[in-house]
Amino acid sequence: EVPISISTKLIKLLAITRMPFSSASLLPIFLVASYFYSINIETISIVNLCLCSLGVLFAHLSTNMFNDYFDNIDGTDKGNFNYFQQVSGGSRAIELGLISIPKTKSIATLLSLIAIIFGTMTLFSTHNSNIFTVVIITITALLLGYFYTAPPIRLVARNGLGELSIFTVFGPLLILGTSFSIYNGDFLTSNYFIDLLLLSVPVGLLTTNILLINEFPDYEGDLKTGKNHLVATFGKKNSRYIYLFNLVIISLVTFYSATILNPILFLPFLFILIYGTKITIHIF
């Protein structure tokens, strides 16, 4: 038997969990931390920031694997022949023989349990007035992530509900959930709630646009298997305008936030504008 090196195992782990995409869930957390740091570092719990980051990371990896599992079960991945394109969705780890279907489900379940453990640990040092809200947000986010592809709800096939759930999870739920978890005080009644609620809009829409772009190369295969996301519902031509509309809202809200919150936000505004315009030109 040929021994497998640690580096090969690590690459395999990165592939089957789609770990590089976890930046979509970690960057909003760091954005919240940066916001509070610019005000006063003592306003947040560093311990909870670390626990929250780990919990969200494992929850995201678990969701990725559950999505691959259910996409394979319902035949979505088997019907997609464009998976070597850079922006095609899914890891294709099962199709490529990197992991079996039962093992995918087992690891996804294990990662979920680890995420729940970190989430529970966070509650022990969360401000009393924020605990209930953190629990509700966490449960909601986990359910939306799981039922994104899981039957019987399968949000991804509900003509736009999948994209709405992605916006909700990676925008308001993640930004506000992190804030409630790490803020040393009653966050809902604080002066920071509206600021971060506003910031959650471009963050959520940015992730939604990334998802939208991934749906374009999967269009034909997803349509055949009943995965009726926005691109499958409205077609490639019309979906371009959905992407453009989201980009305009992202740019406007980010620009407004930069003018009233912190001028440093002009940097991501410029990045979003330049990169978003590049993609817009490509799809049009």
Please annotate each region the language model reported.
Residues 81-125, 228-261:
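Multi-pass membrane catalytic core of lipid/isoprenoid biosynthesis enzymes
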Residues 29-30, 42-72, 133-146, 191-213:
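Membrane-embedded alpha-helical segments that form the functional core of polytopic membrane enzymes
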Residues 164-219, 237:
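Functional transmembrane core segments of multi-pass inner-membrane proteins
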Residues 33-54, 117-135, 174-201, 253-265:
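Helix-coil boundary and interhelical linker segments in multi-pass alpha-helical membrane proteins
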Residues 58-84, 208-231:
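Acidic (Asp/Glu-rich) catalytic motifs at the cytosolic membrane interface
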Residues 90-186:
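Intramembrane alpha-helical segments
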